[in-house]
């Protein structure tokens, strides 16, 4: 159980937000990504995975 809680995912913003839906922009901001090529290491949880799935065309995920 302890190993599962320590899992993280690295998320990188690889496409610009111009011309995207406002909900998708908010999801990217919720992931902590502000500029192009920003990288955040986030805890691997269902909530984070849901945000990533919503904007999968804008981000790159490294497990």
From Swiss-Prot:
Any Pfam family from its record, for instance, is Ribosomal_L30
Alphabetical keyword list? Ribonucleoprotein, Ribosomal protein
A Gene Ontology biological process in which this protein takes part is: translation
Extract the coiled-coil ranges from the record.
Answer: none
- Sample GO molecular function, one term: structural constituent of ribosome
Query: One cellular component GO annotation, for this chain's record?
Result: cytosolic large ribosomal subunit
Homology family: Belongs to the universal ribosomal protein uL30 family.
**Subunit details for this protein?**
Part of the 50S ribosomal subunit.
Put simply, this protein is called: Large ribosomal subunit protein uL30
């Amino acid at each position: 159980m302890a190993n599962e809680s320590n899992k993280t995912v690295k998320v990188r913003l690889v496409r610009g937000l111009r011309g995207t839906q406002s909900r998708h922009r908010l999801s990217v901001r919720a992931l902590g990504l502000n500029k192009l090529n920003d990288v955040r290491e986030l805890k691997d949880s269902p909530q984070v995975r849901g945000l990533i799935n919503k904007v999968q065309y804008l981000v790159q995920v490294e497990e």
